[in-house]
């Protein structure tokens, strides 16, 4: 309710407003009034009913009447009613025509404040003394690469843990003092990088990633930061500059969830939690103009949803619903139009005045009206606080210091300009006397009376607020808000299980918003069950099925385990949002973990039923109800155990790359030691313990016992047999282990005991052990989610490459300060004048007519642009303005040919009267609202990349480099030209990123025009002014520019020549000149009935008020109709007609390359893009080292698990499974690679493809090529770590081909890793979400493994599936690896593998077996024995190879076919990417033409 009060200062005359519910924050519209009225009705109705019930109850139990009246007087009081339940004041009656929403909210707060015994209202202020924040320079001193990462961290370890040196540090915030009392609204001013964000985070007690000096003191009343973080986290919150929400959720669902999590226990009596939260969220949505987006997805930069401004308001509304007492807002007006930004500040002011909250707001572009609302101001200058105190006195303080405030400059702009040496103006007579450096400003402030008074005030506050009683009051107020069954010390409002319930509901809504992943899993797994079970279809109840029956059980367990690995992806998708909500004290991360398990259970259960039902009966496992349900129970339990194990790994790590390697190693270990790949008796002693810790091993033993116990299997093959050998009697034996001479069947129990050392008595014991694993890892997962803090944030630190850092240190530049002092050079100098000629000048006129665009939302066609017309001429800057959601960005996308959805139903776009040609997109520059750049590149590299590929090939490399240098200087980026782009907090800040975005488009020398989408968003006023001056300079050099702008001051707007003004629905309300001092614009609106523009008003804000788009305003007419009927509209059409006729007469450019879609040839594109992708991998050592570590550890683990396997029958099978398990890491390698591909594809598709920087063919080719070197390294590492420990090289000693076969094996392994990356590229090429690509890769990988001939040979496959044997690439790879590794070596059976039987009377073993051995092979251990023959069924490894279809003589053919499969992957990647992702724009063009 706190911020629902915010509109109390808004206009109260707008309840009849006719246009409510649009995208701007509307203040108290009739929609807000209706939402508040409904909330009031519910609360008042509940209160009246509660009153009646209590009175009825008191009559029935008169002996308790006094107690009840006392309770009633204490707890009732939401709406004043008399003893009959009638309203005392009809303005508070929701059913009365006199109801007043603003008055109701104010009165509700008064009543809450008066009933302190029940509601226990408190206020919290903030005081800080000697506040200093610092970071460790070693955390981010230079960019890590593949080569320097290890030395870097070894050096750090040696310095900190061996030498015990603390290492260099840098100050982020210098010592400062301040006091903010409850009800005071404070603005934090400073240029980007001055330390404003760090200051707000520190006040909000969110200092993870940097340090606070031990001598610093921060107090919240009498509470310490430690107490705030531990017990009252939700009372002090920080709203980050960036938006971070679940994109699949709707706005309504997002905000209702936040409201539920902070719904107090001491709410008005009779009002349920859900009703309270639902209606409070509705009120806040209405207040912030979000009601119309209730059912719209929030979205993000890559998923379509609400507009950027609306998404910012969602973040604001979420904090509002948090109802925190201390609110730290970090540039929260970014992306809002000026009128909405002003109303947001008014809302915070009302909250501070009425509810006595303590808001702190960092704001970069602050109008005078907004500044006048603030009580106090904090001015930051490179980490120094150079002023703190009254906002009204700040201006005079600096004037008295000796600085001059120019006319028309707002106070906030004046204060911020003081931190820029090039902007501040010294008053006459004060030259040389005023402070110049940050340190001098700081010292002046410390010595000033104002500074000394602040120190005294802080000391007094700390003394006054140190009592235990005050702490106890805050504790009681917090406890009153908490739900039942919650510890008073908990920072949360609702209990743990209520949190789980609400989060589970939210997760269901997320699944509903994007069901593709779960549907893909369900139908993919069920489909795979049909495929896999058909491989083992209808196994006979005979000994010939022993291997396949156990293999089928193993594969069932293995497949379920593989699918669980993907859950790590979804865990990391939600982690940043969960961490944010933890900081808001909405819920425990453990509650989210619990709820995620609960909401995944239905999907898991459906998959378990679907997969196992099909699989069990198609394979023909034991068909009795008890056995089936036990099989289902064990498989489902094993799935849950593996799910919790992998979730535990995800929760224990901080990045996805960190998680994938241990997860893959663990999966490999659990798979190898399940008991099938290496039977329990054959495991080496040193690794036998792994089997004991393997939940799959216990599940597998139970499944084997379930299938084999007390079951006889008919013998399929006898030794000896055929010819004249007897068909019965003791002189023959069945071939499987566990057979008895003379018996025609094998006892299943004996078979499993002798082969696997399994016991049926362990069946239910093992189930209990699996349950134990489930419970244990469930607890570890929950615990780790709660205590793992995630990746550490950094202070705002510029990051340089190591070589650049050395150069800077030689130049004595202090890069460790974390900030670079930005000196703005003067442009009117000789250098600039000489370089002006370098700016590309236009000459072509671009115009459009009746442009209409609509999208389908559900079943409704919504018009986004409605017959918009206009033009952009060389030398002119046209401003595109309108409220948030008016269609400004959509118009830019439509004009620049960047729409990817929807239909352009009408309209034309012409250049010089001619239709757009194929070179249009590369002939324009488009500075997008999102600053998307490759995070591993430096600023200079990003600019050079754009220049090389977008400037004509006729321009030399030297000229391109010179132009890049010029743009760097033009945009004042010299100080960080060699800095790494990085990520937020460790790299460029917001301002620097925006400058880079503009620079990337300028270095392309767009010859036609430049589009800029909110280029000043997120910048301080001085930087915004310099950007506008730059835009003006470009236009003066002949460039045509169309620029959207959200929060222009009058000074900024004056730099523009023309204005295209849109209202919601994409309707034009004005297109024309601005005129000197905006006279043309103002006269137009006043001529057609608009109220007079006050002389001191900002025309931008006045226009929004005129058309009814400003909060609390109402249009007196439909200005779209006014425009259509105006003479200006007719003049515009006449001008368009004239341009259509005259401009087409201009001669065409005779450049032969003019119509080419790309400036650079394909080969040059390929070289540059491949180099960039390779460099990105090189500079992302976490990816490469994770990849290498996975290969090395898995290969070593595999190699030593099968260490020097012998050539017994089981040994040969072990070596075969060692090859099989070597391939298992494929899907983990794919999952490691997918995020890197997606991040590069997002950058390409959002920015580089629309600008025609390079072709999609180049993009795919570069991705394929850049991975090959790393795959060769992986293959080499895998070869040495696996081939020699397994001992395959020993098999080649018998033929003296150790080196030849070793080299061939290396080549095959390298090809395997190349195949892995190409398969990953094939899977992700046409899919949007990497989770789905990972699922698809698992399915393809499973099929490749299943049909490669290891589990089931070609001869044993059902006839239908033989084609899959030939289509599986692993068929040929396994054939090569096994034949090269095993061919031409002798076989020696283990003791238990010999078949023992007696020869007939009078025969030696050799005499009896010789005819059989000539046909079937094998050898006798005791040829001359007449009592017992010991027969081994195999003599040389070639027999084993023939059984599995591997032929050494065909190794060349097989390796060639495998290479062909790699080629198929690559070709398929090109085709699928073109089919699924390239045609989007093409489809729109076709529909537009039709």
UniProtKB/Swiss-Prot annotation:
Biased composition (Basic and acidic residues): 58-67
Molecular function GO labels: ABC-type transporter activity; ATP binding; ATP hydrolysis activity
Gene Ontology CC terms, in alphabetical order: membrane
Topology within the bilayer: Multi-pass membrane protein
Annotated binding of ATP, by residue: 882-889
Superkingdom of the source species: Eukaryota
Domain ABC transporter: from-to ranges: 151-407, 846-1090
PROSITE patterns (alphabetical): ABC_TRANSPORTER_1 (PS00211), ABC_TRANSPORTER_2 (PS50893)
Parts of the chain that traverse the membrane: 517-537, 551-571, 601-621, 626-646, 659-679, 767-787, 1183-1203, 1217-1237, 1268-1288, 1304-1324, 1333-1353, 1370-1390, 1455-1475
Pfam family of the protein (one): ABC_trans_N
InterPro entries cross-referenced by the UniProt entry: AAA+_ATPase (IPR003593), ABC2_TM (IPR013525), ABC_trans_N (IPR029481), ABC_transporter-like_ATP-bd (IPR003439), ABC_transporter-like_CS (IPR017871), ABCG_dom (IPR043926), ABCG_PDR_1 (IPR034001), ABCG_PDR_2 (IPR034003)
Region (Disordered): 1-26, 53-75
Residues with glycosylation annotation: 1291, 1424
Listed GO biological process terms: xenobiotic detoxification by transmembrane export across the plasma membrane
Keywords, in A-Z order: ATP-binding, Glycoprotein, Membrane, Nucleotide-binding, Repeat, Transmembrane, Transmembrane helix, Transport
Protein's cellular compartments: Membrane
Compositionally biased spans, kind Polar residues: 1-12
Residue intervals annotated with topology Cytoplasmic: 1-516, 788-1182
Cited SUPFAM superfamilies: P-loop containing nucleoside triphosphate hydrolases
PANTHER family, per database record: ATP-BINDING CASSETTE TRANSPORTER
Family the entry assigns: Belongs to the ABC transporter superfamily. ABCG family. PDR (TC 3.A.1.205) subfamily.
Protein name as catalogued: ABC transporter CDR4
Organism: Candida albicans
Gene coding for it: CDR4
